[in-house]
Amino acid sequence: GPTHEPIDPVRYIANRSSGAQGTAIARALSGLGAEVVFVTGPADIPPPEGIEVVRVGSAREMLEATQAALPADAAIFAAAVADWRVKSASDSKLKKTKGGMPALEFEENPDILATVSKMTEGRPDLVVGFAAETDDVIDNATAKRGRKGCDWILANDVSPATGIMGGQENAVTLITAEGAEEWPRMTKAQVADRLAQKIADALA
């Protein structure tokens, strides 16, 4: 799901991710017998039952929880983590003033996928990322895989016309060192089942 980056005690920066795909992946892996630690932001979808759940709010909290969950055989990064946060979130609610707009200064959030992918010790055997794109989906996702250092990346087109962000279906392309494998549009549960089986096969 998303992360929430605070502006003040009542406002935050977020995105439209529901958490449905990540939740489905956790459920599918657990169904295959994996011991799953599910690190989740403030998602709309309740987490699967029977697995360890770690709830976080911000990107920095998600990084800390992810590192605490290691070591692991595989790490799957499906969360829609905010790229930026407000540099100095206010401790009190920002008041609206006539003719005035608050000036917000941003700074970059930690890159969780790249941090884990580039670990020199204790790196998971398989690191899987997601690339939510709106333009040049395959090219951008392929470049992201190389930049982040992950083993696989699942690319999807989240343009508004697709209905994927926040919807029940997904259409992904699995990008690995061997190339790109386009999957048909299917439910997020079906995507999760297919990915979970591929992960199990890769680790066997």
Regions found by a protein language model. Name each.
Residues 41-42, 46, 50-114, 118:
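A glycine- and small/hydrophobic-rich beta-loop-beta segment
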Residues 29, 76, 145:
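Conserved RecA-like P-loop NTPase ATPase core
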